From Swiss-Prot:
Alphabetized GO MF terms: structural constituent of ribosome
InterPro entries (UniProt xref): Ribosomal_bL17, Ribosomal_bL17_CS, Ribosomal_bL17_sf
GO biological process: translation
Protein name according to UniProt: Large ribosomal subunit protein bL17
Transmembrane segments: none
Positions of the UniProt region annotated as Disordered: 125-154
Designated gene of the protein: rplQ
HAMAP family in alphabetical order: Ribosomal_bL17
């Protein structure tokens, strides 16, 4: 009975798929959190978890092995110094995938992938407060525009 392969193809050739996942992994290391499609996030999670497990060894061989995939020296340094120090105590599950609303243009399922132990996540209260402030500014700005249009019409 045919079972199929355990990985998503993402509509790409094997080389393009590997390059995409390596690029997403690099950006995740640099930014600690990225927004992408749900399928790409789940595949990136597989790749980055294996990289962190290798990086926890801290050997030169591990660095060279990871450098085959991530060709950014800054990202390698951050992975070995910051990320491993932060999530090194865990035995796996270094990342989380948070599902978001569908993308407006094509209704693709979107998700955020981020490292678990980083407290840089935006708290809901802070984002809600800033959105209220932005809304107040927009309302004031629109009132000024309405007044200006009314004056010019007279």
């Amino acid at each position: 009975m045919r079972k199929g392969k355990p990985a998503r193809k993402l509509g790409r050739t094997a080389a393009h798929r590997r390059a995409t996942l390596n690029n997403l992994s690099t950006q995740l290391i640099l930014h600690k959190r990225i927004e992408t499609t749900e399928a790409k996030a789940k595949e990136t999670r597989k790749v980055i978890e294996k990289m962190i497990t290798k990086a926890r060894k801290g050997t030169v061989h591990a660095q060279r092995d990871i450098f085959k995939d991530i060709r950014d020296k800054k990202a390698i340094r951050i992975l070995f110094e910051e990320v491993v120090a932060k999530v090194g105590a865990r035995n796996g599950g270094y990342t989380r995938v948070i599902k978001l609303a569908p993308r407006l243009g094509d209704a693709a399922k979107m998700a955020i992938i981020e490292f678990v132990d980083y407290s840089e996540a935006i708290s809901p209260a802070a984002s809600q407060k800033s959105s209220k402030q932005d809304r107040a500014k927009r309302v004031q700005g629109s009132k000024k525009n309405v007044d200006a249009v009314a004056e010019s019409a007279e």
